[in-house]
């Protein structure tokens, strides 16, 4: 077995996830395959104070000098995984977005309105309720899928695979997805 010379970086985005995978690949732009898995939160409150070293995924990629993203993965629709991907996609225009739902589901989704739960008196304190975080994530998911397709990328449904699948000359992935019945119920609930 040959040694892998890529790099995996777990970006400190707080409670969510944001993982950057880089591997040399002469067939990719700049001879580098770049994959972004989840993007952390889009909420300002997650990064306020910055005494914990938390950083927005887009800001981290900018500081690192990342020039492109070949593959973006949204593992599931939660605010602290999905919402941070939107500014990344706006800046780096991924070639593909892998996500767990049917590829056209986002086209059927209606925009969701937020509640006033972050408001005390007449002043909004920027604190989202759990329900509003999920609404935000659903709205951002739809925007993300639209942006990727409008920029020529593909929205792809991840499905369980019997073996490791190559995504570049140096990177293979094994997709572990939810039970088919669970996924179908989630899709029905969101439609």
Where are these regions (language model features)?
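Flexible, acidic/histidine-containing loops and adjacent segments that form or flank the divalent-metal
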Residues: 1-6, 82-191
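Active-site metal-binding loops of divalent metal-dependent hydrolases
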Residues: 13, 38-42, 77, 161, ...
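Conserved acidic residues
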Residues: 34, 70, 95
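A generic structural signal for short
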Residues: 46, 73-74, 132-133
């Amino acid at each position: 077995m040959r040694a892998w010379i890529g790099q995996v970086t777990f970006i400190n985005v707080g409670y969510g996830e944001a993982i950057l995978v880089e591997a040399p690949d002469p067939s990719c732009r700049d001879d580098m395959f770049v994959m972004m898995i989840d993007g952390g939160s889009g909420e300002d409150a997650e990064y306020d104070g910055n005494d914990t070293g938390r950083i927005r995924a887009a800001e981290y990629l900018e500081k690192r000098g990342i020039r492109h993203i070949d593959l973006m993965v949204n593992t599931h629709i939660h605010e602290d995984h999905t919402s941070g991907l939107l500014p990344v996609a706006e800046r780096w225009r991924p070639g593909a977005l892998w996500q767990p739902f049917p590829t056209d589901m986002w086209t059927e989704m209606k925009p969701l309105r937020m509640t006033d739960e972050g408001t005390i008196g007449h002043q909004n304190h920027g604190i989202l309720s759990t329900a509003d975080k999920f609404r935000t994530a659903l709205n951002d998911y739809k925007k993300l899928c639209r942006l990727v397709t409008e920029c020529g990328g593909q929205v792809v449904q991840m499905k369980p695979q019997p073996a490791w699948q190559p995504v570049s000359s140096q990177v293979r992935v094994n997709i572990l997805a939810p039970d088919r019945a669970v996924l179908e119920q989630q899709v029905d609930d969101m439609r």
